[in-house]
UniProtKB/Swiss-Prot annotation:
Presence of keyword Transit peptide: no
Entry cofactors: Mg(2+)
Enzyme class: transferase
CDD domains: NT_KNTase_like (cd05403)
Role, per record: Antitoxin component of a type VII toxin-antitoxin (TA) system. Overexpression in E.coli neutralizes the toxic effect of cognate toxin HepT. Neutralization is mostly due to AMPylation of the toxin by this enzyme.
Protein name: Protein adenylyltransferase MntA
Keywords recorded for this protein, A-Z: ATP-binding, Magnesium, Metal-binding, Nucleotide-binding, Nucleotidyltransferase, Toxin-antitoxin system, Transferase
Reaction equation(s) it catalyzes: L-tyrosyl-[protein] + ATP = O-(5'-adenylyl)-L-tyrosyl-[protein] + diphosphate; O-(5'-adenylyl)-L-tyrosyl-[protein] + ATP = O-[5'-(adenylyl-(5'->3')-adenylyl)]-L-tyrosyl-[protein] + diphosphate
Length: 99
């Protein structure tokens, strides 16, 4: 899989925001982790934080993760904003780049 820049990931997600909202009920989506910190390597996955209009079924959540992987051509670690534990939440919310 080819590595993308943060800007390319943002651009792809932005271009598909309407579909993400309509098909998956995504209210807010952003990138955090190694891509935001400029530490991503060839084998890095992309960490994506998502907030839904209503909590999806597990099947729908997995479907979204697979959709994003196909869209970006990268492995995706999808994290629900509502499931962040307080210890890590501060770090994630400080570095997340929303699109």
């Amino acid at each position: 899989m080819a590595m993308l820049t943060l800007e390319e990931i943002e651009s792809i997600l932005t271009a598909h925001k309407k579909e993400l909202r309509e098909r998956f009920g995504v209210r807010e989506i952003g990138v955090f982790g190694s891509y935001v910190r400029g530490e991503a390597k060839e084998d890095s996955d992309v960490d994506i934080l998502v907030d839904f209009e209503e909590i999806p079924s597990l099947l729908k959540f997995i479907e979204l993760e697979e959709y994003l992987e196909a869209l970006l051509g990268l492995r995706v670690d999808l994290v629900m904003k509502s499931s962040l534990k307080s210890g890590i939440a501060k770090t994630v919310l400080r570095e997340v780049v929303y699109v």
